[in-house]
C-alpha cells in the first residue's frame, strides 16, 4: 500500500530540491541530552525552540496558516510553540505550512520533537494525517498519524522509495492509541543499509519514551542520504475538507547525527 497520489510526492521532491540548492547545513553542536533514546556520540544539528517562524537555520515556504502561539502545557517552552492551523473548509492533500532544515546528505540521524494535536481532531478519510518527512534526492519517508476520521490514531512510518516495496511500518513493539489534546514526545531514528542491497537498514520510533516500532531489515535507496527534513503536516490524501478549525502544535524540534568519531 502506498500513500495516495505519488505525483504530489514527486512534485514536492522537485520543489524542495530547488529550494535547498543554496542552503548549507550548520555546524554541529553538543547533544542536549534531553532525548533518552538518542544514540551515544551523536551531535546536534538543530534544537529549534520555535520562538520564531524561521530562524536557527530553518526556513519556511507555502506557509499561510502557521503562527507562534503560547501553550501553558508545552513541555519545554510554554511561551512559544509552532502552530499549524487547519481552518474549517481546509482541503485534503495540502499542509498549512512547511518548515524545513538542510541535512547535507546524512545516512544516519535522530529526530526528536514535542507535538500536540487539537482535541477534537477530524482525521482525513484516507486515514493519513502526515506529521514529518525526511527527503533524499529522489524519494522521502513520512511519519504519519494514522487512523479513521474519528480515531483511534497511532503513529506509522512509510518509506516512499521503490526498494521498500510500499508497505507501512506499523507499531510492532508497543501499540498505543494517541491521546488528543496532550503533548507527546516523539523520537525517530533512521540508518541506511551498510551497503546498498544489504537489507540491514534501521527505522525505529518511540512515543512518550516507549519504543513503538523497531525495523532492522529495511531497504534504503541508492543515493547520498537525506538532504532535507520537513515539518509539513499534510492532511490526507486528497478530497475531504475540515468541518471545524483544528491544529497541530510543535514545541522543540531536535535533529542529531553521529559525531566524527562514530561515522
Stretches found by the model and what they are:
Residues 25-263:
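Low-complexity, Ser/Thr/Pro/Gly-rich disordered linker/stalk regions
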Amino acid at each position: 500500500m502506498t500513500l495516495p497520489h505519488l505525483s504530489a510526492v514527486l512534485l514536492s521532491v522537485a520543489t524542495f530540491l530547488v529550494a535547498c540548492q543554496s542552503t548549507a547545513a550548520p555546524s554541529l553542536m553538543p547533544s542536549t541530552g534531553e532525548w533518552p533514546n538518542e544514540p551515544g556520540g551523536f551531535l546536534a544539528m538543530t534544537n529549534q525552540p520555535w520562538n520564531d517562524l524561521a530562524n536557527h537555520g530553518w526556513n519556511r515556504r507555502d506557509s499561510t496558516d502557521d503562527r507562534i502561539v503560547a501553550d501553558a502545557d508545552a513541555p519545554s517552552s510554554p511561551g512559544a510553540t509552532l502552530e499549524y492551523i487547519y481552518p474549517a473548509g481546509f482541503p485534503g492533500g495540502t499542509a498549512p505550512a512547511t518548515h524545513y532544515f538542510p541535512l547535507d546528505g546524512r545516512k544516519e540521524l535522530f529526530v526528536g520533537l514535542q507535538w500536540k494535536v487539537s482535541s477534537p481532531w477530524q482525521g482525513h478519510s484516507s486515514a493519513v494525517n502526515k506529521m514529518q518527512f525526511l527527503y533524499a534526492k529522489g524519494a522521502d519517508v513520512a511519519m504519519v498519524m494514522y487512523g479513521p476520521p474519528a480515531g483511534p490514531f497511532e503513529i506509522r512510518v512509510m518509506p516512499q522509495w521503490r526498494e521498500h516495496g510500499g508497505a507501512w511500518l506499523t507499531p510492532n513493539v508497543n501499540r498505543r492509541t494517541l491521546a488528543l489534546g496532550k503533548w507527546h514526545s516523539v523520537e525517530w531514528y533512521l540508518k541506511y543499509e551498510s551497503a546498498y542491497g544489504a537489507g540491514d537498514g534501521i527505522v525505529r520510533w518511540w512515543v512518550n519514551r516507549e519504543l513503538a516500532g523497531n525495523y532492522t531489515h529495511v531497504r534504503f535507496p541508492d543515493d547520498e542520504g537525506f538532504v532535507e527534513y520537513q515539518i509539513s503536516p499534510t492532511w490526507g490524501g486528497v478530497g475531504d475538507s475540515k468541518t471545524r478549525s483544528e491544529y497541530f502544535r510543535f514545541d522543540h524540534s531536535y535533529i542529531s547525527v553521529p559525531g566524527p568519531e562514530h561515522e
